[in-house]
């Protein structure tokens, strides 16, 4: 039952990403996102369903074959003109508000803990504050439209959101297939289908949204230094 709920939510998030891309980005960019997302989801799904994700005998370990490309993609979004274009095209409030999808992810991770598939450390009951990032996302989406102070607060919130993700990622890696630390139950979920889509898609999506938001905020904050451009920038 948990797997069915997870896959349903995964499809919902993926469709939302494609829908927003189609609404705000050029057709060619939207097609590239759709094709790239489809290929990546198939890759992660096959990789995990065949057992490679939890195979610690691989060199490098199976998790690297998923996390490695994700890191390269995030760097591309952070540094490329394409990333800047996407950040400029999608309204800032929408980029920030989309982070609320993390509420559903955290509820599902809590369910996995109840099923004995992840340690309590990865849940909001165990001190994971990522749920609060998701809950505050709609509020921050509104605050970001309130002038330069709002932009500054949104920038700080994004930094805190990235730190929260880094904490969860580190905890997941340490308790994952490599078993670098011991917990009351091992983190087996992240190495099996379909839950490998948490490190393989959902967590990277959260990071990507933060990176896009930071790029958008930086651009808008620069614009507000000019009175004429500041008015138009803050209406987005």
Each PLM stretch: what is its role?
Residues 1-15, 55-67, 196:
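Hydrophobic transmembrane alpha-helical segments in integral membrane proteins
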Residues 9-19, 67-80, 132-141, 197-215:
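Hydrophobic cores of alpha-helical transmembrane segments in multi-pass inner/ER membrane proteins
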Residues 24-27, 79-85, 212-228:
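Membrane-interface capping segments at transmembrane-helix boundaries
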Residues 26-37, 90-93, 150-156:
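Membrane-interfacial loop-to-transmembrane alpha-helix junctions, especially the N-terminal start
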Residues 39-111:
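A glycine-rich, hydrophobic loop/mini-helix early in the fold
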Residues 83-150:
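Membrane-proximal helix-loop-helix units in multi-pass membrane proteins
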Residues 154-170:
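Hydrophobic alpha-helical membrane-insertion segments
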Residues 176-197:
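Short, membrane-exposed interhelical loops at transmembrane-helix boundaries
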């Amino acid at each position: 039952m948990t797997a069915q709920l997870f896959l349903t939510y995964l499809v919902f998030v993926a469709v939302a990403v494609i829908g927003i891309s189609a609404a705000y980005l050029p057709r060619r960019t939207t097609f590239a996102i759709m094709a790239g997302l489809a290929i990546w989801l198939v890759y992660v799904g096959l990789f995990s369903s065949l057992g490679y994700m939890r195979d610690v005998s691989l060199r490098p370990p199976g998790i690297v074959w998923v996390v490695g490309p994700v890191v390269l993609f995030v760097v591309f979004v952070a540094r490329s003109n394409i990333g800047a274009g996407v950040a400029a095209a999608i309204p800032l409030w929408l980029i920030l508000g989309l982070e609320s999808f993390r509420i559903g992810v955290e509820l599902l991770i809590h369910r996995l803990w109840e099923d004995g598939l992840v340690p309590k450390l990865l849940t909001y009951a165990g001190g994971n504050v990522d749920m609060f990032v998701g809950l505050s996302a709609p509020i921050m989406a509104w605050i970001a439209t309130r002038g330069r102070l709002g932009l500054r607060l949104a920038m700080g919130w994004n930094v805190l959101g990235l730190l929260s993700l880094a904490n969860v990622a580190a905890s997941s890696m340490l308790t994952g297939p490599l078993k670098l630390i011991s917990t009351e139950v091992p983190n087996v979920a992240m190495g099996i289908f379909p839950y490998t889509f948490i490190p393989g898609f959902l967590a990277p999506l959260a990071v990507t949204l933060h990176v896009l938001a930071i790029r958008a905020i930086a651009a808008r904050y620069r614009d507000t230094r000019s009175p004429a451009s500041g008015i138009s920038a803050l209406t987005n």
